[in-house]
């Protein structure tokens, strides 16, 4: 072995030997590294200087090659880019959609390239078939601002499409015609707003001019000085810059639709001129973009300010249905274990008496065999906020549907004694007897009278149009009886009021025509100030007039005649412009004869005398009048048959006593079986299907406490032979009394006389149990409905997020939509489960639904035949499962159709009582009845739901029918739908 020094030297020389052997390889690596570093530095420098032609944007490689090959290209801006409409990434589009309804629009700042080719036009977005007159109503539109019906352009800021119920959003850039101060003005019918930015950025937008806010304001075309807000303050602009602007316009169904924006120099005498094409440019080119591509649409203060249509917290909801209810969130509470309920009740056969089960039905006759269910507690599906326009809930005739018709339900209290200011006498006899007595029975009337009041009780109130006249005449008579006017005191005797025993109208003798004379200014003034007494029409002209009213009016006429005859007053002769058929001074003698007025010089004096002596009276109001009234519950008048004449009633209400009795018996059985393990927390919902022969079926939904854990019970129970509401009691007696008031004897409720047990005997109906794990498939056929498809997908995403339910899926059958890529929209959504099927040809709803049904392979899953324009409550999936029972029952929820301009936050509309297009049914049951009728309903629809209903009932299935809270059908435009073609109007 060598010395240690020699060994150390060998170790140091070994790396040198290795480097010498690999020197060439190391040298090559060093050269490559230096070259790459040099290239990197060169690229960075060229990018900063803008000199690299590869750094430019060209439409294609061919354009790039031409640019590199050309030797004669003059020097241009090195940052020049060839324009191609930008398709933002899916992520950006999703962000744009999520921000469409909140204040994050302030962060919207998408750099959209601008080209000189954009000059001459502005972007125009049209929102069709949306009622209202205010800009706020436009912002409340579900699709505003991202999903308009039409995207087009405009050549000048003056548009009048001659259409109704629409909204416009015009946006782009303004190029000022000069430097300096400029004023803007806007005119429109109805409301409109003009917004302008400080520069070309959308973030600096400010409101400069407007026409109203409430929807009641409008102007004529070119009328810029009607409202103070129409003309803006002077704004400093530069002709070398461009400025982003927006115009919002809302038009209702009245007037001449127009909106125009004008400008002028801030000089004395300068006139406004409409902004024309040389001073406009597009914000972006939308020609090749699909309707579902919305990332380029600017979201600004103009499009979003005040856009939330949710009422403030301190404001009451416009409909009681919008108030919080435990039913709305019950789906979040876990279900009680089935094993704990198995032996709580005995099993019993279930076959209700109202099933059709094979009986032959005529076409569309099944609607008559659908029964409504009762609910407890009140779910406030009655549209009470709509009863100003529709009072059908009170079961009054169309003639009597006014507030005065409720007079028969109150009984006026008799005054104990007369005060000094209200002496006893004729006024009591007339007013009290005719106005406050009990409702009289029908009396014989003339043929004309019977046409207006046939089949109704005679009311003591005055009919529309008669009340004012009768009331003032009545007070005139009463005031005259007490003798406030001295010249008439001599005539205060009962002999002046002969009673008439018939309803024959008073015959007035014809007056001979007298040439009219020109009145002096004083006479004309007296004539204008004359308090005229309206002539009462003959009895036959006013339907519904009672005998007392007819007699009383005749007495008034005779009384006035006595007054004039005693003072030698003759009636004036009608002159030009004074029609005797209208307001005249009534005059008649006791025998009903009137002497003709003599022509001559005394005519004007007689007329002046008439004007001078006509008395004026103020009506006496009895502010201390009290009355008595009984409890009224008009729900007692309703039956479980579908009422096609009333679409605001909502669900039938189950009597509280009955619901509590069934719940009490069930909880007692549950406590006995589980040894008191569960305690009742709250009765959330009880539904009853009435069966008068075999006992009703109840659906109990209870919140129970299992120790400290909250669980829910949602189960069907049956009562054998117990009918619930048929037992006698105080509430039932009041209901029969109310029926006697409103119904005619032949239409009164027939009471079942069979005796029944005081306590219900509960049991589990065999085979009638719902599956809480069943998969629900929402099937929707579509064609060219991009904005609604996007909304439907967003609603389904929201349901998935809120409920966390993994057992539902959506199926969209698409008839080759051209306005969006439906399949791509589904792929980029957050839906867990979906299916897409592309079809061809014209839109056919039945065929589209059947194609979606065929995609479902599991026969034990639920098919929900759906519509595209639906707003779903959060618990819709759980509700569909609970009301679909395989082999037993289908579910047809009743949807509320919103009026034009209404929203789910401000719902105005009606229940779709006769529509069954929204239907939940098990796949096995639907296959059993043959599915959709695709042969008969091809190019037409409307009736396919009733035809399907006929087959469901004939198969022995029940159809559950309930009005669902917060279940809305959006109002939508029908233009372009259902294979409709457009026709150019002259």
From Swiss-Prot:
Chief place where the protein resides: Golgi
Bilayer disposition of the protein: Single-pass type II membrane protein
Residue spans of biased composition, Polar residues class: 301-311, 444-453, 481-505
EC class (word): transferase
Keywords, alphabetical: Glycosyltransferase, Golgi apparatus, Membrane, Signal-anchor, Transferase, Transmembrane, Transmembrane helix
Segments in the Lumenal topological domain: 46-986
Record-annotated membrane-spanning stretches: 25-45
Keyword tRNA processing on entry: no
Enzymatic reactions: an N-acetyl-beta-D-glucosaminyl derivative + UDP-N-acetyl-alpha-D-galactosamine = an N-acetyl-beta-D-galactosaminyl-(1->4)-N-acetyl-beta-D-glucosaminyl derivative + UDP + H(+)
Region of interest (Disordered), ranges: 301-324, 434-466, 481-552
Cytoplasmic face of the membrane: 1-24
GO MF term list: acetylgalactosaminyltransferase activity; glucuronosyl-N-acetylgalactosaminyl-proteoglycan 4-beta-N-acetylgalactosaminyltransferase activity; N-acetyl-beta-glucosaminyl-derivative 4-beta-N-acetylgalactosaminyltransferase activity
Compositionally biased spans, kind Basic and acidic residues: 312-324
Pfam families from the UniProt entry: CHGN (PF05679)
EC number(s) reported in the record: 2.4.1.244
Entry GO terms, CC: Golgi cisterna membrane
InterPro entries: Chond_GalNAc, CS_glycosyltransferase, Nucleotide-diphossugar_trans, PA14/GLEYA, PA14_dom
Annotated compartments: Golgi apparatus, Golgi stack membrane
SMART domains: PA14 (SM00758)
Listed Gene3D superfamilies: Spore Coat Polysaccharide Biosynthesis Protein SpsA, Chain A
Domain PA14: 109-278
Family according to the record: Belongs to the chondroitin N-acetylgalactosaminyltransferase family.
Biological role: Transfers N-acetylgalactosamine (GalNAc) from UDP-GalNAc to N-acetylglucosamine-beta-benzyl with a beta-1,4-linkage to form N,N'-diacetyllactosediamine, GalNAc-beta-1,4-GlcNAc structures in N-linked glycans and probably O-linked glycans. Mediates the N,N'-diacetyllactosediamine formation on gastric mucosa.
Record's protein name: Beta-1,4-N-acetylgalactosaminyltransferase 3
Organism: Mus musculus (Mouse)
UniProt lineage: Eukaryota, Metazoa, Chordata, Craniata, Vertebrata
């Amino acid at each position: 072995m060598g010395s240690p020094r020699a060994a150390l030297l060998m170790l140091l020389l070994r790396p040198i030997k290795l480097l010498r052997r690999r020197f060439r390889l190391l040298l090559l690596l060093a050269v490559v590294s230096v070259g790459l570093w040099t290239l990197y530095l060169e690229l960075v420098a060229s990018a900063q200087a803008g000199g690299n032609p590869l750094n430019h944007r060209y439409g294609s490689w061919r354009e790039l090659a031409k640019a590199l090959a050309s030797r004669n290209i003059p020097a241009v801006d090195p940052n020049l880019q060839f324009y191609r409409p930008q398709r933002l990434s899916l992520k950006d589009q999703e962000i744009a959609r999520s921000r469409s309804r909140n204040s994050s629009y302030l962060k919207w700042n998408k750099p959209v390239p601008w080209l000189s080719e954009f000059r001459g036009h502005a972007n125009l977005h049209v929102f069709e078939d949306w009622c209202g007159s205010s800009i706020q109503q436009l912002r409340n539109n579900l699709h505003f601002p991202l999903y308009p019906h039409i995207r087009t352009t405009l050549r000048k800021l003056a548009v009048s499409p001659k259409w109704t119920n629409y909204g416009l959003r015009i946006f782009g850039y303004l190029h000022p015609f000069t430097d300096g101060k400029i004023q803007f003005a806007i005119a429109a019918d109805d409301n409109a707003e003009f917004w302008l930015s400080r520069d070309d950025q959308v973030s600096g937008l400010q409101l400069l001019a407007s026409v109203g806010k409430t929807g009641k304001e409008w102007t004529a075309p070119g009328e810029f000085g009607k409202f103070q807000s129409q003309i803006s303050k002077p704004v400093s602009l530069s002709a070398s810059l461009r400025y982003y602007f927006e115009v919002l316009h809302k038009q209702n169904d009245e007037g001449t639709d127009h909106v125009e924006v004008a400008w002028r120099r801030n000089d004395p005498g300068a006139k406004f001129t409409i902004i024309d094409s040389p001073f406009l440019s597009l914000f972006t080119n939308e020609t090749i973009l699909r309707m579902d591509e919305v990332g380029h649409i600017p979201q600004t203060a103009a499009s979003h300010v005040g856009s939330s249509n949710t009422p403030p917290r301190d404001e009451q909801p416009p409909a009681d249905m919008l108030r919080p209810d435990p039913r709305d969130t019950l789906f979040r509470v876990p279900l009680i274990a089935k094993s704990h309920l198995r032996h709580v009740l005995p099993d019993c056969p279930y076959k209700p008496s109202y099933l059709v089960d094979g009986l032959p039905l005529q076409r569309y006759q099944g609607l008559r065999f659908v029964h409504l269910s009762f609910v407890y507690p009140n779910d406030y599906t009655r549209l009470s906020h709509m009863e100003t326009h529709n009072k059908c809930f009170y079961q009054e005739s169309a003639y009597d549907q006014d507030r005065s018709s409720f007079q028969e339900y109150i009984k006026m209290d008799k005054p104990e004694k007369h005060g000094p200011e209200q002496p006893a006498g004729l006024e009591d006899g007339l007013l009290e007897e005719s106005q406050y007595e009990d409702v009289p029975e029908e009396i014989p009337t003339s043929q004309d009278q019977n046409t207006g009041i046939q089949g109704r009780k005679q009311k003591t109130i005055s009919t529309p149009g008669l009340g004012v006249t009768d009331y003032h005449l009545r007070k005139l008579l009463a005031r005259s009886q007490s003798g406030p006017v001295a010249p008439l005191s001599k005539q205060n005797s009962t002999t002046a009021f002969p009673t008439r025993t018939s309803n024959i109208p008073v015959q007035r003798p014809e007056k001979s025509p007298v040439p009219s004379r020109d009145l002096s200014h004083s006479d004309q003034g007296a004539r204008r100030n004359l308090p005229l007494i309206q002539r009462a029409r003959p009895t036959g002209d006013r339907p519904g007039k009672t005998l007392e009213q007819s007699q009383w009016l005749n007495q008034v006429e005779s009384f006035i005649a006595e007054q004039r005859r005693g003072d030698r007053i003759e009636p004036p002769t009608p002159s030009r412009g004074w029609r005797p058929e209208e307001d005249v001074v009534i005059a008649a003698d006791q025998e009903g004869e009137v002497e003709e007025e003599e022509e001559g010089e005394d005519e004007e004096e007689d007329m002046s005398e008439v004007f001078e002596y006509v008395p004026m009276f103020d009506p006496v109001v009895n502010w201390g009048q009290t009355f008595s009234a009984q409890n009224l519950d008009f729900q007692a008048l309703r039956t479980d048959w579908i009422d096609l004449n009333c679409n605001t009633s909502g669900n039938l209400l189950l009597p509280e006593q009955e619901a509590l009795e069934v719940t009490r018996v069930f909880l007692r059985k549950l406590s006995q079986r589980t040894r008191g393990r569960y305690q009742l927390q709250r009765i959330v919902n009880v539904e009853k299907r009435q069966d008068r022969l075999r006992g009703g079926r109840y659906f109990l939904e209870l919140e129970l406490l299992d120790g400290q854990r909250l669980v829910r019970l949602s189960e069907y129970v049956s009562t054998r032979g117990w009918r619930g509401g048929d037992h006698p009691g105080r509430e039932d007696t009041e209901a029969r009394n109310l029926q006697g008031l409103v119904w005619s004897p032949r239409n009164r409720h027939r009471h079942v006389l069979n005796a029944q047990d005081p306590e219900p005997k509960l049991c589990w109906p065999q085979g009638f149990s719902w599956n809480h794990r069943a998969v629900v498939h929402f099937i929707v056929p579509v064609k060219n409905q991009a904005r609604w498809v996007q909304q439907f997908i967003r609603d389904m995403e929201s349901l998935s997020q809120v409920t966390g339910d993994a057992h539902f899926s959506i199926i969209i059958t698409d008839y080759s939509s051209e306005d969006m890529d439906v399949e791509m929209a589904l792929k980029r959504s957050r839906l867990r489960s979906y299916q897409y099927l592309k079809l061809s040809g014209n839109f056919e709803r039945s065929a589209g639904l059947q194609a979606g049904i065929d995609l479902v392979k599991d026969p034990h899953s639920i098919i929900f035949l759906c519509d595209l324009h639906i707003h779903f409550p959060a618990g819709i999936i759980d509700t569909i499962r609970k009301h679909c029972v395989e082999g037993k029952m289908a579910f047809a929820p009743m949807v509320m159709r919103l009026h034009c301009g209404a929203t789910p936050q401000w719902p105005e509309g009606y229940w779709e009582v006769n529509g069954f297009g929204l239907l939940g049914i098990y796949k096995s049951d639907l296959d059993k009845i043959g599915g959709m009728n695709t042969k008969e309903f091809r190019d037409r629809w409307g009736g396919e739901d009733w035809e399907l209903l006929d087959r469901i009932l004939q198969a022995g299935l029940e159809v559950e029918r309930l009005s669902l809270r917060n279940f809305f059908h959006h109002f939508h435009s029908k233009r372009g739908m259902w294979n409709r073609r457009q026709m150019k109007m002259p």
